[in-house]
């Protein structure tokens, strides 16, 4: 790892945010009831979306809750790029059903909507009140996040992205209190993801890792996570797209996206996400694809200031850089990103 502390955070205090407990592996979703009970939850609101319902994943989870004789309520109307209206509707269900905890089931949209409910349940007001950094004052209800995609890492982050329907912008809420208490990444729940979604979420994870790695807030801890994430994405994403039933590839991508989440949750993101969020908020475009399309262009822009880092990215992504100058090696990273994107079928542009 090529980290020069003198050029980073020597002498400064840094922080590292992750869930209290994380479960990864085939069948770990069966532990939802026991984990929820261990943190004080008795009747959760399950926040999910129609895609999860139609795929039969919600029934898989409710069967687990039923077997444990755990009561629950369901909000299944979350949309891609969840809105302030989604949060308000879900919170009404939470109150009406007298829930005391939250289980989010899905990808980034369901997790973000559920986090929004957590803000209102713990602190009151409207979701708009929490736009910005660490605006909440009181704890969340007990919260278990169950992931079904390998990309957003929302099941383990302190980020909550909600579309403000009046302004047509995505509100960025960054708050350590919305970090789930328990994160669950069960590759069994990801087997049915179609190739296009697998590709988009996987490239979202790569974007997280790359942006965190070249961030001015990067630390040795985030570097370690970002490097391993990029290595695993390069090893497993093509396989997961080609064969969704490839258990090793699915589990590899579980780890990859989680590691990328650990990186960006603590080193933050960059211009790719800044632009992708606005495309999602204004045009309702899919987040993962926007990131994948923008990543090579923003990386080329950033490359001139971080050549050595991009040279390292090139090597992690399988490029041979022996004998090349720092500039030449850094260009190989852009080529590797483009190749991976093309290999998994990401569109070449936004049109």
Segments from the language model and where they lie:
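N-terminal small/polar loop signature for handling phosphorylated ligands or for N-terminal nucleophile
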Residues: 53-126, 239-250
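Carboxylate- and glycine-rich phosphate/diphosphate-binding segment that chelates Mg2+/Mn2+
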Residues: 159-267
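Glycine-rich phosphate/pyrophosphate-binding beta-alpha loops
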Residues: 151, 258-291
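Gly/Pro-rich interdomain helix-loop hinge
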Residues: 282-351
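Short glycine/serine/threonine-rich phosphate/pyrophosphate-binding segments
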Residues: 29-32, 54-57, 84-85, 109-115, ...
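Glycine/threonine-rich beta-strand-loop-alpha-helix active-site module
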Residues: 85-188
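An N-terminal, well-structured beta->alpha segment
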Residues: 1-75
